[in-house]
């Protein structure tokens, strides 16, 4: 005979209403109660009818997740943290990617709303000026931003500007005076722009001149000529490169090696994200490390709190970052502060065509 919710209530010792809440809104039930009810459900092999539950409660147990890309492990690590807690709560995630395109962000939001998701967890190109987020606020669809650090919207992130400031200050403390920043498209990412502001502020606060940031495609197979031109000219050669993310730093380290530069003997490289794979490189990548999986977990908790009617005085949750030292950064002395290298670096292009 098929078990019913009454059977689960009788075996667990809780009311039918409590069992129903454990099934339909597990975040509203205490962990011990939830564990007891789930044990009874498994013992009885009770399987709720999902269609009937949706029709009765107008609930889908679906949460939409919008990420820029799966290519960057930052977002997949975050998704792992999200999925961990979503599964425990009995929810399913519908995940879409946007490739940092605002039109695709709009399409993703519209698609997920048509799927009747009960909330959104998302990263957008620019959270500070985003009419679609304003529309979600007006319509009452709950959401939490991840990696977008904006003080006026519900979000979970690190302080990107402060994190970059601390990373560049770490380079300065190691003796570097000419630090070049490489980034993807600054226009496509408010996070990259905040990191650039932190980079520039750190140098300015130490009485140093920020260099113009170079924007490159981290999917490109080779370092662009513009970067190589900086590195092969004694007048413009930096002693360290700060990359706006770890994937870019890995591309840079590969390009430097192919151009006969040694990291860190000829030039130091600092990334941003703290990806575990960076520690497997030779030399291990120094990086500003962010708690990516915990960002996902915290975003889920924030969304659950919003769905339960809880509010926070500060809608933005800022998680701590750390500067992870690594073999890709070395200390240099006063004689090296001019940015002319340590005597081992190349003085020319080494056969590379640095022109278009």
Q: PLM features: what roles do these ranges have?
A:
Residues 15, 61, 118, 176-178, ...:
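Short acidic/polar active-site loop segments enriched in Thr and Asp
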Residues 100, 122-166, 247, 273-285, ...:
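Flexible loop/hinge segments that line or gate small-molecule binding clefts
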Residues 1-60, 343-344, 353-356:
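N-terminal helix-turn-helix DNA-binding module of bacterial transcription factors
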Residues 35, 46-119, 185, 196-203:
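Amphipathic helical "hinge" segments at domain boundaries
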Residues 105-116, 223-236:
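Short, well-structured alpha-helical segments in soluble
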Residues 211, 225-356:
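Flexible loop/turn connectors
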Residues 68-77, 95-104, 156-166, 182-227, ...:
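Hinge/beta->alpha junction and helix N-cap segments in small-molecule ligand-binding domains
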